[in-house]
Amino acid sequence: MFVLNARHLMAAGLVSLAAWSAGAYAGAVEQLNAFVSNVSTARGEFVQRQVKGGTNGSPLRVAGTSNGDFVFSRPGRFVWRYVKPYEQQLSADGQMLYIFDKDLNQITERKLDASLGSSPAAILFGSNDLAKNFTLKEGGTKDGIDWVELTPKAKDTQFQRIAIGFRSGELQGMELRDAFGNTTLLTFSNIQKNPQLPANVFRFTPPKGADVIKQ
């Protein structure tokens, strides 16, 4: 299972799922399908927020914020780089996933095919066959953003709820809620669709002296 925690990858969204209303424009499901079908490469920036609360009437509070940039080429090749507050990089070359923690000078290595599955990363970086791993439905519109909810078909997934938002076909954010009630929000910006990418952009070279942990 491809799961990235507060200092790793994936999660997301812009707003709470609770207040959504019916949407306009093309439906969110249609926008998502168009995105995964028509965008084979992309690069952009993100802000990731870990949110606590929101259950039993408790207020939402931001427990942590990080930001960075990403680049991907479907299927299964990407670099997801955290810049602040900690430097960390996740690199996938289509076969292997490498998670490099600069502070620890440590690399975690695992096979990518066993990592994507029904994970949030599969939505952004995987193939365009979303229906194989997810059930999709319209999530409504909030503040001009159309949302689609994705429910993993796998029973052993960590995530109870995944949502991804678009505005006029442009990717805006993701939201993840795990089995423990924790929510991660991702806001995307400065996205370039289908840029020409250097051939070696997804080639990971371990830094000298780094510890390597194979999983």
From Swiss-Prot:
Keyword set, alphabetical order: Chaperone, Periplasm, Protein transport, Signal, Transport
Keyword Calcium applies: no
Similarity comment: family membership: Belongs to the LolA family.
NCBIfam families (UniProt xref): lolA (TIGR00547), PRK00031.1-3 (NF000661)
Signal peptide: 1-26
Biological process annotations from GO: lipoprotein localization to outer membrane; lipoprotein transport
HAMAP family: LolA
Subcellular location: Periplasm
Protein name per its UniProtKB record: Outer-membrane lipoprotein carrier protein
Source species, domain of life: Bacteria
Main localisation: periplasm
Function: Participates in the translocation of lipoproteins from the inner membrane to the outer membrane. Only forms a complex with a lipoprotein if the residue after the N-terminal Cys is not an aspartate (The Asp acts as a targeting signal to indicate that the lipoprotein should stay in the inner membrane).
Pfam annotation, one family: LolA
InterPro entries found in the cross-reference section: LolA/LolB/LppX, OM_lipoprot_carrier_LolA-like, OM_lipoprot_carrier_LolA_Pbac
Alphabetical list of PANTHER family matching this protein: OUTER-MEMBRANE LIPOPROTEIN CARRIER PROTEIN (PTHR35869:SF1)
The UniProt record lists the keyword Nucleotide-binding: no
Gene Ontology CC terms, in alphabetical order: periplasmic space
Organism: Ralstonia pickettii (strain 12J)
Subunit structure: Monomer.
